[in-house]
Amino acid sequence: MKHKFTILSAILIVALTACCLFACNDKGDSPAKVDYQSDNSYFVKTAESETALTFEPILDPVYSESGLTYKQVDYRFGVIFYVGTAIEPKYYEYLGNALAKQGYLVVMPKVTLNMTYAYYKAQEEAFSAYPNVKFFVAGHSQGGGAALRRASENADTVAGAILLSPLCYRHKLLDADGNPVKDEESGVDKYIIDNLKDVDVATLLVEAEQDHVLSDEMKADAKTRLKEGYVHKVISPAAHMSFSTMDNDEILKSFNNDGDGITEAQKQSQRTKTVEYILNFVKGLSN
């Protein structure tokens, strides 16, 4: 009898130990929750595919011969960032890293010739790729115009819009088959002017004081497309192209003779303030 009791006790101890180990491992493997109101410091995993450059927050990365292992993060919010005209996503890495460090998944879609608005896609792939993530849509220059358009077309889906010196356009009205809709009387293609005036989308507009790329008319036009109460920040000194880290002097000279006249230190300060303004904006809406 005593022998049977000893065996039963041993079996019970083994079973309890196994359950405990399973519970511990299960807890360890479950994604870490993000407190978006805290000043976080996640590691950032950068991945590049044919369609996007992605910045993912992770924990406890371990590099070995077999590759990278890490603890997953349960990020509930993200930022889709559309690039400026002819600027590759890699030139916005500073922004992707800063946002991912705070717990946001950042996706920078790749488009033909880096012309986001010209090659605008009717469906945003990140929405279906990450169905559990609530995305802010953001962009710079032409990409800002694309972000405004995305926000207007997907107002019920996005968490907010972030526009960095946006270059806004109008585009053709298309039918369900993707064909241009024509005016019944004139036969001319109908156009849509994207705007957020009549939709409930929180919006941040950040402008560069020394912007020699956008005209005053272009800047004014962007503001007319926004709903009253949007958050507006102006950085000075700051240049249009310096929201990216691309060496831009030659590009700027094609728009104006002397470039923007902004020093490297001032460009870095502009980008630091850009990160600060965006984080303050998204953290206030990440509930």
Regions found by a protein language model. Name each.
Residues 19-23:
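C-terminal motif of bacterial Sec signal peptides marking the signal peptidase cleavage site
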Residues 138-147:
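Gly/Ala-rich beta-loop-alpha elbow adjacent to hydrolase catalytic centers
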Residues 27-74:
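N-terminal cap/lid segment of alpha/beta-hydrolase-fold proteins
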Residues 95, 201, 214-224, 247:
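Short alpha-helix in the alpha/beta-hydrolase fold that links the catalytic acid
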Residues 199, 205-207:
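Short beta-strand/loop motif that positions the catalytic acidic residue
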Residues 111, 162-171, 208-210, 237:
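Active-site nucleophile loop of the alpha/beta-hydrolase fold
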Residues 96-116:
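Conserved alpha/beta-hydrolase
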Residues 75-84:
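Short beta-strand element of the alpha/beta-hydrolase
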